[in-house]
Amino acid sequence: ISPTFMQTVSVFDVESKTWYLQNTTGDIPPQLTEFCSVLASAADGSSHNIYIYGGYDGLDYNANPSDDVYILSLPSFRWVKAYTGTNTHSRSGHGCIKVYPDQMLAIGGQHVDSTHCLEGGVIVNFNLNTLRFEDEYDPTKWSKYKVPDLVTKWIGGK
C-alpha cells in the first residue's frame, strides 16, 4: 500500500497470459485497503465499470474509514468519484455483491467508533444508476444498468 496505489493498476492479458501495469487518470482514490467492489458493464459491452466502496488507508487503523464510492471505467482506465460519504456511515472490511444490474449491497464491516458502527444498517444498498444509497431494499424493484451520466461525461458514450 502506498499513496500512489490506485494510480497504476495491474492487468492480466488473458490472450498473452501476461501481467502489465496500466496507468489511471481522473479522480484517483486515496490509498485504500479492505474496500469492496463490483463490476457493471454497459449494455453494448463498450465499457466496464468497477465500483469500489469504503475501506481505510491501511496504515492508521484508528482513522475513520472511507464512505466514498469510486468508479474505474475500462477501457479508458479513468477514475470518477461517484459518491462522497460521511464519517459516520463509513466502513472497512465489508463485502459487496451486485444483486441486480443496478444495485450493490454492502454487507458488514467495521468502524473505528463503535457508536457509529455500521450506521444505516449492517446491509446498505447503493444504486449503481443514481449513485446514491437507497433508504430501503425491495427485491421486486430494480432496473437495467445504465452507465451513469457522471461517467459518460468523462469517457463518452451513451
Spans of features found by a protein language model:
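Extended hydrophobic-aromatic, low-complexity segments
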Residues: 46-49, 60-66, 79-81
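Conserved short beta-strand element of beta-propeller blades
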Residues: 1-3, 9-11, 25-52, 69-71, ...
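A short beta-strand motif characteristic of beta-propeller blades
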Residues: 20-26, 80-85
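Residue-level signature of beta-propeller blades and closely related beta-rich strand-turn architectures
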Residues: 43, 56-58, 110-112
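Beta-propeller blade signature
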Residues: 2-17, 64-78, 118-134
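Juxtamembrane/interface segments of multi-pass membrane proteins
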Residues: 25-28, 59-63, 86-87
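CBM-like carbohydrate-recognition segments
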Residues: 99, 109-121, 133
